[in-house]
Amino acid sequence: MNKTELTAAVNTRRTFAIISHPDAGKTTITEQMLLFGGVVRQAGTVKARKSGNFAKSDWMEIEKKRGISVTSSVMQFDYDGKRINILDTPGHEDFSEDTYRTLMAVDSAVMVIDSAKGIEPQTKKLFQICKMRGIPIFTFMNKLDRDGREPLDLLNEVEEVLGIETYPMNWPMGMGKGLKGLYDRYNHRVELYHNEAHGETFLPLDENGELDPSNELTKDSIYRDTLDEVELINEAGNDFDEAKVMAGDMTPVFFGSALTNFGVETFLKTYLQYAPKPAAHKTRDDQVVQPTDDEFAGFVFKIQANMNPNHRDRIAFVRICSGEFDRGMDVVLQRTGKKMRLNNSTQFMADTRETVETAVAGDIVGLYDTGNFQIGDTIYAGKNAVQFEKLPQFTPELFMRVTAKNVMKQKSFHKGIEQLVQEGAVQLYTSYSTGDYILGAVGQLQFEVFKFRMQNEYNSEVVMEPMGSKTARWIDPEQLDEKMSSSRNLLVKDRYGAPLFLFENAFAERWFADKYPDVKLTSKL
């Protein structure tokens, strides 16, 4: 496509992540959006685990069983003239590394908050990553169909705990059994709750911001209370400032109920009016790659094995940062300098996929991977080499020794470990002295998922022996003497062959530093 067509296509893209604490309703709101995009025919299937109707975004077997998202799914659909790429992030804290990387691939975030609980620990963590990146954050206060906290309390908490200004785009008229509707400040109307809407869903407000006096609702005390509260926020609240929203310093707040599909479409439509187009990306040498640059470039932010268990496949997820992707095009893998042809490409609806012929900056494409890619890789098609900024990686804190339960199944054991480690699901270390495999993770759940997937996807039962929490510290190979290793500081190498010590506690690390004052240890990964 020519420059004008490319720019027009890029301008329709909206790529965002949904962040929340577990159980705040993230999966349900995702389902409702897919419903509006005509992608799913039935929403509200998320809770119905016994019926076999699992959430579209929770495709992995363990996610279906436990009802939590443990990997980031990618879903694409068209709505209101925009092409939307939603990245669903794991809500569970043990999967922060996968989530961090996912948040590097989006241009904005939707924060879902349970109106009965307010800000919860995981929401706070994920918010801070978005804040660090300076991306716009839009808030959906969920579960209005149940009794929750006072809306003003919720806004105050967001401002105080997260340090971001709020602007309520609408205001609840009651909650729980007394929910009447939403007073929509932005669209200047009242959106009636399903039970209250007899034929009409939206009622216009007059120039004073009130309903026609002949409407029955005007006699309800909930309506009068809402007018008082709206008057208060009009006078004492923040003014809407689009520049602040774009800088991530103000969050537009929407109320609603994802479960009953109330206020979700209004949110989606309004969000799409303000959500940013694909942003420019910085390279490691401080160059800026614009989305409408002619040459294709993108980076791998996630690798997922066994999206189709029948084929033992691996998919590398690529965020396109500039130009146009065409199936069959030649690109260079920056890390190796190797040329490769991208024949097998796909786009997703969680577990269903279709071959993609073309895509542009802002889109997420999946590339079938035979082991070429690593997380953080840059691929580019132009003459000038491009290398995007490094993706964050975490030093594990928990460690387990892992062996195959059945020694006759070493082949599937090694294949499973290799693939799951390349995904970044766990880190792998090998003992210098014994050759034992040691897994490292940020949280316990990662080990559980690893064990489950080894058995389920690779037919390899594993024995895992806890080693407790350790501190990982890398050492320059030139300074290494294998005699430095002891029971308190185990010498291992990482998957790239770099040596490091696993210290059992801070005391062991201090003792080592005193004994070898010239040796420099780092916590890098």
Curated annotation (Swiss-Prot):
Gene name for this UniProt entry: prfC
Binding site for GTP: 20-27, 88-92, 142-145
Known function: Increases the formation of ribosomal termination complexes and stimulates activities of RF-1 and RF-2. It binds guanine nucleotides and has strong preference for UGA stop codons. It may interact directly with the ribosome. The stimulation of RF-1 and RF-2 is significantly reduced by GTP and GDP, but not by GMP.
Compartment list: Cytoplasm
Name of the protein this chain belongs to: Peptide chain release factor 3
Listed CDD domains: RF3, RF3_II, RF3_III
Family: Belongs to the TRAFAC class translation factor GTPase superfamily. Classic translation factor GTPase family. PrfC subfamily.
Signal peptide positions on this chain: none
